[in-house]
Amino acid sequence: MRHQSCRRVTLNYSMNKKKIEIEHTLNSTSRNIVWQLIGTAEGLNRWIADDVKMNGKHIEFAWGDDWRHHETRQATLTFCDRYERVRWQWDDEDDESFVEIRMERSSLSGQYTLHVTDFLSTDDLEWLQDTWSHNFERLRRTSGV
C-alpha cells in the first residue's frame, strides 16, 4: 500500500534538509469541502493529527492518547489564503522549513489536488512518504474524498 496516494514526489535540498513535495488528487469538486479539510482545526483533525487546536496563529497538534504514547507539537500559522493554501512552521524548528498544503482545481475534471510541501532533516525519506500516504488514506476513510 506504500505510496498509492502519491501521484508525484519531488525532492529538493534546502537548509540542510530535504524538501519533499507530494501531490494527491481528491475525489471532490467542492472548494468549500476541500478548504474545510485543510484550513480549519476540525478538518486537520480528521486526517493530520488526533487532535488539532487553533487559536489565532497558534496551532497545537497532538497524536496518540493521554494514557499511552502521546506527542504534541506547536506550530505558528505563517500563511493562510482562503481557498488556496495554508502554511505553518513548527515552533521547535530553528530554520525556515515549513509545512504547506495547497489546493488546486483541475480544469479538465474539476477535481481538487492537494500539493503538500514538507521538510525532512534525516535520511528517512520513506518514513515521511509513508506518513503522508497514511494521512491521505485517513482523509479518504474519514471524509470520502
Label every PLM stretch briefly:
Residues 33-35, 44, 59-61, 77, ...:
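Hydrophobic pocket/interface hotspot
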Residues 23-33, 66-70, 108-110:
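Short, charged helix-to-loop "capping" segments that act as catalytic/coupling loops
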Residues 87-141, 145:
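Beta-strand/loop substructures that line and gate deep hydrophobic ligand-binding cavities in soluble
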Residues 3-53:
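Hydrophobic ligand-binding cavity/cleft-lining segments
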Residues 45-92:
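Glycine-rich portal/gate segments that line the openings of hydrophobic small-molecule binding cavities
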Residues 21, 70-74, 95-100:
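Short, surface-exposed coil-to-beta transition loops
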Residues 23-27, 76, 102:
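Generic structural detector for well-ordered beta-strands
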